[in-house]
């Protein structure tokens, strides 16, 4: 409710949200479960200091997820506003970017594929994180989740030989077939698989990680791609980008 109140202020001006976040940063960090620093107390202009909650990783994660869900819920009709507010929460250190990335790549919603505002927001977050201290953690998480979603979607498509068979999208069907819910669901999954494959290659090109100090860890993640045609395609792209 607290974060929804701050998010609602965004209906007047997004800059009003930024101003209030800056003013109440100590309180908001405490509620979100992250560490409150001396600088945060100075910015908030308060001498009162919050107690250490000693949260477990699970408890911290739950708080971070509640923040994301509460803001997306209140701005369900204007996702661009919701994601912009979430970006500001990350900028102020109130929200860990990894939780937003997990939400964007949740296979139950596939927001990064289905919502343009989400993809644009994640791209901005990734660009910022890529030059920060948490770049390795964020990038590894990103690729790991994409590969997990590829494998998960592959399993749901029902390909006869999922490891060796190339996933093709059914593009020709009759008017009568349009009423076949099972067929239409399968085509949706084929497109989803295709979209995640494209997303993986896009981010590979974007970050050019072949010369990073964790390129081996990236390749290990790609080795877990279950569909060999996709794995071969990705590995070939890595070699092309290396030279």
Which sequence ranges carry the predicted segments?
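Long alpha-helical repeat solenoid scaffolds
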Residues: 1-243
